[in-house]
Amino acid sequence: DLYVSIIRKVKETVSIPVMIKMSKMVGNIPAVAHTLTVNGADGIVLFNRFYQPDIDINNMQIVSGNVFSNHSDLSDTLRWTAIVSGKIPGISIASSTGVHDWEDVIKCLLAGADAIQMCSAVYTHGAEIISQVLTCIEEWMHQAHYQSLDQFKGKLNYANISNPAMYERSQFMK
């Protein structure tokens, strides 16, 4: 497999951790994540955001669509972070796409993320959003009586909830 050979070559060349940023369009996300990590990836990033074209109807041109994620993009990130972290114990996951505020960060941690990327929020609001997010997380942790992230990381992942079907179901009708 091309990805496995690339991971192995990169790992032979560098001495830093190698995380693979995955697309949410792969057929079996947990299986692909497992394959990547057993073949050398130090973890995965969920998810890569695709270039999204748009059509300018006034100038009759293809143009760049919205390059930034939004809150509605977070649902897939939470779902798959929770499923993968629950099905593959010990996997390192960075949640990405749709993370815009401190509550989104906490949700990703509860789903099982080890790290969170919030690039669109930083581009939109500036780097100062990071300190604001950290302050709000600390306040929430204090109110919830948590002293460390490890106390709640993964608490609501696939393996730790009474009804895992909440993550499996993706259609309105069964």
Give the residues covered by each predicted segment.
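Alpha/beta enzyme core
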Residues: 1-94, 100-118, 162-170
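Small/polar loops that bind or transfer phosphate-bearing groups
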Residues: 96-97, 125
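C-terminal helical cap(s) of enzyme catalytic domains, especially alpha/beta-barrels
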Residues: 55-70, 123-146
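Residues in flexible loops and secondary-structure boundaries
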Residues: 54, 107, 124-126, 130, ...
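Alpha-helical scaffold segments in soluble metabolic enzymes
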Residues: 9, 35, 83, 128, ...
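Extended, intrinsically disordered, low-complexity segments
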Residues: 74, 135-174
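Gly/Ser/Thr-rich helix-start
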Residues: 98-99, 155
